[in-house]
Swiss-Prot record:
Matches recorded under Pfam families: Thymidylat_synt
Gene: thyA
Lineage: Archaea, Methanobacteriati, Methanobacteriota, Methanomada group, Methanopyri
Swiss-Prot/TrEMBL keywords: Cytoplasm, Methyltransferase, Nucleotide biosynthesis, Transferase
GO biological process: dTMP biosynthetic process; dTTP biosynthetic process; methylation
HAMAP family: Thymidy_synth_arch (MF_01686)
Name recorded for this polypeptide: Putative thymidylate synthase
Amino acid sequence: MLGKGRPLVVRGRTVEQVWRQAVTGIKVHGEKVERERGPVKEVRGLIAHLEPSGPESFDIPDDYPLDEHSVRAYEDQLLDPELRGFEYTYGHRLRRYFGLDQVTKIVERLSESNNTRRAIAVTWDPRRDLDEEEVPCLTALQLQSDGGSGLELHAFYRSWDVGKALVANMIALRRLQEHVAERAGLEPTTLTVYAANAHVYEEDLPDLP
């Protein structure tokens, strides 16, 4: 088990590498805990860093629990402002819920000054989410220049289902990163996720590598 307060750190050139390292890390170092939605193995603190080498870095692993249709549907939802029958979606929270399109504002901010540290979007609404059951896992994201023409994306999760969601999440975040980079005249580079609680549900363990 990791030391108290010490995060698990994984890095790779592909989402598959990051996913396998994160799952293995949680299996080895995770603690068994009973949570609201069932027993999990978890680490409290995960940093997952991806340095993609090309489009193939985002190929879906053959043994990933979700099929390609599910991954692409999630990817589309991240930029779609419509709720489409859900209690919340990330696209709605990012682009409509707070009365403004945060993605467009980020593009504008980076276009005005690509060295800004204020290109931040949030999904968490404390007025609602502290009392609800269905709440965002992704709570905030920040896009920032790498000091040149590259654009990094940093995402913050309160809770992250590494077993089933990591690959789909990172693919969708990359699409958002590309969307912003293209409109701001930058090139998407690295993608880093910080999760306060990263876990695998015990019922999913037999189906994971």
